[in-house]
Design a protein with these regions (language model features):
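Thiol-based oxidoreductase modules, predominantly thioredoxin-like and allied folds used
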Residues: 3-30, 48
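Register position in tetratricopeptide repeats
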Residues: 74, 78, 108, 146, ...
Length: 300
């Protein structure tokens, strides 16, 4: 984001007029303490605090300039912040859609215990009112998984299948994903990915399997093989393709596997424009391939 979003003139102007901006390294100085205090779970995380240091909202992950600016304006206006949603819910007790929005906000703020409290209320409401609509139950399962309760998510997905609710095939697939993660076992998901012709499902399956293999670190050749298959499912229309290909190349460099393929992918990434991080990856791969002079040329 440093190279595009933070250098956008509109965002610089907004920050100048509305914010006091501080950049903190979460690994140095007061960073580790602030990381714990504000429950930072990923990078980049942009916290928007009021004058007393209370969190109004946060923006997690990469955002292109236009989207990032919209988020800043939304937070400044107090729209769909936690306090805004809580006020709306207080005025409309029992509104399930508001409960869902509060749950999602607590998840975004990395407060899983509070999120689960509202999730339990929604699940109880659905059960007591025999409200078994696929999208409602499916959304509920996704949220339970996000807050760290995959076993509840799996139970809900199994319920969709048992009741033969519309789109139960989707529930079956996500059940496979969650069970693979929970059991740390890729066998069923590997079988599924070999049978399905659904590209989206293949992508999701590959990424879940790759995460498990990377965590276990017991079959790096299979991880590399599946990583290549996964990135090959994306075409040049995918807006984050350069970043995806660079990530693949860096991982292959770490593993010391599929280096020629990694070089091919990093060259494709550079077709979208030169980027210092991607150039560094290319130099590293060339070096490991023994093409030292070419690596030095890239660095220079």
């Amino acid at each position: 984001m440093d190279s595009d979003t933070y250098t956008d003139e509109r965002i610089i102007e907004f920050a100048k007029n509305n914010l006091i901006s501080i950049k903190i390294d979460a690994e140095k100085g007061a960073g580790p303490e602030q990381k714990i205090k504000y429950r930072i779970g990923g990078y980049p995380t942009i916290l928007v605090l009021d004058s007393l240091g209370n969190e109004m909202d946060r923006i997690v992950g990469y955002r292109p300039p236009e989207e990032f600016l919209k988020e800043l304006i939304r937070i400044k206006n107090g729209e769909n912040t936690l306090s805004d949603l809580q006020k709306k819910y207080k005025d409309n007790l029992g509104d399930i859609s508001l409960q869902f929005n509060i749950e999602k906000k607590y998840i975004d703020l990395n407060v899983p215990d509070s999120a689960k409290k509202y999730l339990d209320l929604v699940q109880k409401y659905y059960s007591e009112n025999n409200q078994f609509v696929f999208q409602d139950l499916f959304d509920l399962s996704q949220l339970y998984n996000r807050v760290g309760f995959p076993e509840i998510a799996i139970d809900i997905l199994d319920q969709i299948i048992d009741l033969d609710i519309d789109s139960s095939e989707t529930a079956y697939f996500y059940g496979l994903l969650f069970k693979a993660k929970q059991d740390n076992n890729i066998e069923d998901l590997m079988e599924f990915v070999d049978l399905t012709d659904d590209t989206t499902r293949k992508k999701q399956s590959y990424w879940q399997i790759i995460r498990i293999l990377k965590k276990n670190a017991d079959n790096q050749s299979l991880e590399a093989e599946l990583y290549l298959k996964a990135v090959n499912l994306y075409d040049k229309k995918y807006k984050y393709l350069p970043r995806l290909l660079n990530s693949f190349a860096r991982r292959m460099s770490e593993l010391g596997l599929l280096l020629p393929e990694a070089l091919e992918k990093v060259n494709i990434a550079l077709e979208f424009g030169e980027d210092i991080k991607i150039l560094n990856t290319k130099a590293e791969i060339l070096w490991k391939l023994g093409r030292v002079d070419e690596a030095l040329e890239v660095i220079d």
